[in-house]
């Protein structure tokens, strides 16, 4: 098992407010870190149930098209200024200098190699980059990797439904926990840069009574299906995050957050 660099941080944060209760279910055996250049077995997927409109968000050009390339940097001054007052605000539980920006290649839908940025906590930057290297080697499709957008509480009123084909894989966002009941009072693990949401459209948050906020995600509520970008128990996504000590919201008791992986399992 890959030794999680964020383990000490997890111990420190055990007293942090919980966003959602995680289950006591046993997790699958985590894989050992593959030897350099040894790919994880490819994930077999079926086409999406319907074509999605092309997103207008800017896409970075891959550094190389043939292999995985990733890097970790301190937040550039321009980016720090850009997110100040939007996804980061004074009083957030992690300072700006406690964050890092990753840039890495990933397999998009299609498939095609794309490249995107992700902001995470500095303590877990190496581990998160390693996870996305495993996903790249397995050719697991990621719809889009991009920075999170500013959280607006009014958009998350209790049981308010939306229709959106946007599906952005992202991490840091200084915001509260959000459920179908609306925003909570506690910080989400995203506010610490210790959580990643992968393909949110294809892996929605589903309540125990079957409520899904995004109507466009309804085809993905049947978790026995194998549609492009879906995450399943024991697959390369779950196993790779487990190898760095992170837990999956798809294993929660009660509500399921199929997109969500976090260091503290909540």
Where are these regions (language model features)?
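Sequence contexts marking disulfide-bonded cysteines in secreted/extracellular proteins
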Residues: 19-21, 91-93, 173-175
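Catalytic cores and adjacent binding grooves of peptidoglycan-active enzymes
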Residues: 57, 61, 180-266
């Amino acid at each position: 098992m890959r030794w999680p660099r964020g383990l000490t941080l997890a111990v420190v944060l055990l007293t942090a407010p919980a966003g959602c209760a995680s289950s006591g279910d046993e997790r699958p055996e985590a894989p050992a870190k593959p030897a350099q250049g040894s790919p994880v077995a490819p994930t077999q997927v079926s086409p999406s149930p319907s074509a999605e409109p092309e997103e207008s968000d800017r896409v970075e050009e891959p550094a190389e098209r043939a292999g995985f390339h990733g890097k970790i940097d301190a937040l550039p001054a321009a980016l720090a200024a850009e997110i100040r007052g939007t996804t980061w605000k004074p009083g957030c539980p992690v300072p700006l200098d406690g964050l890092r920006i990753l840039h890495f290649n990933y397999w998009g839908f299609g498939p095609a190699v794309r490249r995107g940025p992700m902001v995470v906590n500095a303590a877990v930057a190496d581990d998160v980059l390693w996870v996305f290297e495993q996903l790249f080697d397995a050719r697991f499709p990621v719809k889009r990797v991009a920075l999170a957008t500013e959280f607006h509480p009014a958009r998350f009123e209790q049981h308010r439904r939306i229709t959106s084909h946007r599906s952005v894989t992202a991490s840091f966002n200084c915001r509260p926990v959000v459920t179908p009941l609306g925003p909570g009072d506690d910080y989400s693990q995203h506010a610490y840069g210790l959580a990643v949401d992968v393909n949110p459209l294809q892996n929605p948050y589903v309540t125990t009574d079957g409520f899904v906020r995004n109507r466009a995600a309804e085809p993905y509520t049947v978790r026995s299906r194998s549609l492009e970008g879906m995450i399943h128990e024991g697959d390369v996504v779950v196993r790779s995050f487990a190898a760095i000590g992170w837990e999956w919201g798809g294993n929660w008791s009660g509500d399921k957050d199929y997109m969500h992986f976090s260091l503290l399992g909540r």
